[in-house]
A protein has these predicted regions:
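Compositionally biased, intrinsically disordered low-complexity regions enriched for acidic
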Residues: 1-86, 90, 102, 123-143
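Intrinsically disordered, low-complexity, Lys/Arg-biased terminal tails
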Residues: 94, 98-153
Length: 153
């Protein structure tokens, strides 16, 4: 019988493998989550992040860089167990707090693992699109932008 080996992520230093390509400030400037991720609750974040940010109190698809809706509903996030009490808005909220220096090891490990797994969408764009064809796979490009990967590949 063939043994199946699972990659043991626990042995990895999660902080070393986490290398986002975009800062929260840059992501907000480019246009993510229809501009409405935080609503009006932005006081805990640096003001400089919002100087050129595309923000709105309600979701506005025209504020997304690729003008498409990308991602799943909040209800789906909750159903999948992707929302934690520490970051009730989800991954991007965690990322912003992480960038600002907050560390909660068990949450960081989960979120960094989720970020790492999202790279499959970068690979899909690279395999299926001509380099620089920003009209190709716009939904995936918007999604990887919302996960701090460079969508301009």
């Amino acid at each position: 019988m063939k043994k199946v080996y699972k990659k043991n992520m626990e042995n990895l230093d999660f902080y070393k493998i986490f290398k986002p390509q975009l800062s929260p400030k840059k992501m907000l400037e480019l246009g993510i989550f229809g501009g409405s991720y935080f609503g009006s609750n932005i006081k805990e974040y640096p003001k400089s992040w919002f100087e050129k940010a595309k923000i709105s109190k309600t979701f506005d698809i025209t504020l997304n860089r690729f003008r498409v809706k990308a991602g799943l509903s909040r209800e789906h996030w909750i159903e999948k167990g992707w929302i934690f009490k520490e970051d009730p808005l989800g991954w991007f909220q965690w990322y912003c707090r992480f960038i600002n220096g907050r560390r909660i090891t068990h949450i960081d490990e989960i979120q960094i693992k989720r970020w790492k797994n999202f790279k499959r969408h970068v690979t899909a764009i690279e395999k299926n699109c001509e380099r620089g064809d920003l009209g190709c796979r716009k939904r995936q490009r918007q999604a990887i932008l919302q996960w701090a990967y460079n969508p301009f590949i």
